[in-house]
Every structure is written in C-alpha cells, then in structure tokens.
C-alpha cells in the first residue's frame, strides 16, 4: 500500500482528467487503470459552467479520490487563492500545488512554489508540490511542510520520459523515506516502468493517456507497467557491467586433450 499523508491507496497510478475525447472515454480510462486518485483543475472545470457540473458528477460516480490542482497559476497569490477555492468545492485538504514560472517549458517557479507551500501548509493543506529534480528545492519544500514530493522527469506534455535519470536516482537516494511521485513528461509505459525501477512510489500522468489513440487501453498499459516496475525494483535488478559475465557455469565442462 502507498501512504500519502494520512491516506493509504492500493494503486500507484494517479491519473489526470484533462483533454480526453469525451467523458465516457475518461470514465473507461479510469476504470481500466484501476486508479484511486484523479487530479482535477478547478479553473478549467469551473469555466465549463453546466459541463463542469456534469464532470464533477462523473468523478463522484467513479468513486475515486480527488486531488485538486492549481494548474495555470503563475503567482503565489493566484495559487493560494485557487487552492482555497478547491478546498471549498471538493471538501479536501489535498492540493497538487503548481506555480508555473516559464511559459514555454512550464517549469515550476521554485521560489514561488516554496512560498506557496509554506502558506498552504500553515493553513492545514496537505500539499503535493510539482517541482523539479533539484535537491535543494526539495529540502526547502519539506521544511515548508510538504510530506510528499512530485519531481518532473521532463517538461509537461513533452512525452520525452526521464531526461536526467541520474538526477532522478539521486533524488530517490536522498529522500529514502519520503513518498515520491514522478509528475510530468512521461510518454510511454516503458518510461513509467523505468522510474518505478528507480524506486519511485507512484506516477502521475495525463496527456500520455488522454492523447493516445485508445486512452482506455493506454491507461491499462500504464497500470501494468507501473506494477511491473515496482515489482522489479523490489526484486533488486542487476546493475549494468562493463564486461561480459558468463551465465552458464563451466563446472563439469568436458575437457578434450
């Protein structure tokens, strides 16, 4: 089981709810993934009027836990206000905190992120911060009250997969007891399996499923890959070697003279 703050969940796949072809496709993807947590943008759905109300009803029917986010926020003030509105709407202290600092890369504004995390933690929120793989920033987020960290593996929506495996491995090694969720940049199930093999606790993704030719099938593929990566990590895979090592023992080999 994965423990996030005071909640235990069985699935290690967190699924975003944006950009699906239809509500029916989203619902089927959630079911096939067997996810227990979905992320929701309050700003996007609130702007949808009646459609937003239908969306919220669909989420309730699926019986999953909602992790609201502050997607699209570019300032501390904006992110804090959105988080407070989300708490009122969804009646949860959970918030996926995003403070975007760069329009092209959608890279987090790590200075604003830490400040917003400190404010929200002080007001009783349980913060899931979308951050980079910078260890110093991560330490400051923990000092600000975060008990979960969500480093990216590549820019949002890029589908590039882990662009800096060494940094992700170092992040895991530096925070062995902190729940770590890879967020952003995952494009294929093999990417998800790879980060789980590094020892990460979960993967959050959206575009890789919503933008697939068959989102429901892709959601299931990701769920299987995440499970496989987790099992592989627990099984302690072999480390790469520079030289060949024979897999067949030579004991008992016939000797010809």
From Swiss-Prot:
UniProt keyword list: Cytoplasm, Plasmid, Schiff base, Thiamine biosynthesis, Transferase
An annotated GO BP: thiamine diphosphate biosynthetic process
Enzyme Commission code(s) on record: 2.8.1.10
Reactions catalysed according to its record: [ThiS sulfur-carrier protein]-C-terminal-Gly-aminoethanethioate + 2-iminoacetate + 1-deoxy-D-xylulose 5-phosphate = [ThiS sulfur-carrier protein]-C-terminal Gly-Gly + 2-[(2R,5Z)-2-carboxy-4-methylthiazol-5(2H)-ylidene]ethyl phosphate + 2 H2O + H(+)
CC annotations in GO: cytoplasm
Chief subcellular location: cytoplasm
Keyword Cytoplasm tagged: yes
Subcellular location: Cytoplasm
Binding site for 1-deoxy-D-xylulose 5-phosphate: 157, 184-185, 206-207
UniProt-annotated catalytic positions: 96
Pfam family, one: ThiG
HAMAP family hit by this protein: ThiG (MF_00443)
Biological role: Catalyzes the rearrangement of 1-deoxy-D-xylulose 5-phosphate (DXP) to produce the thiazole phosphate moiety of thiamine. Sulfur is provided by the thiocarboxylate moiety of the carrier protein ThiS. In vitro, sulfur can be provided by H(2)S.
Family membership: Belongs to the ThiG family.
Subunit description: Homotetramer. Forms heterodimers with either ThiH or ThiS.
Identification of the protein by name: Thiazole synthase
Gene designation per UniProt: thiG
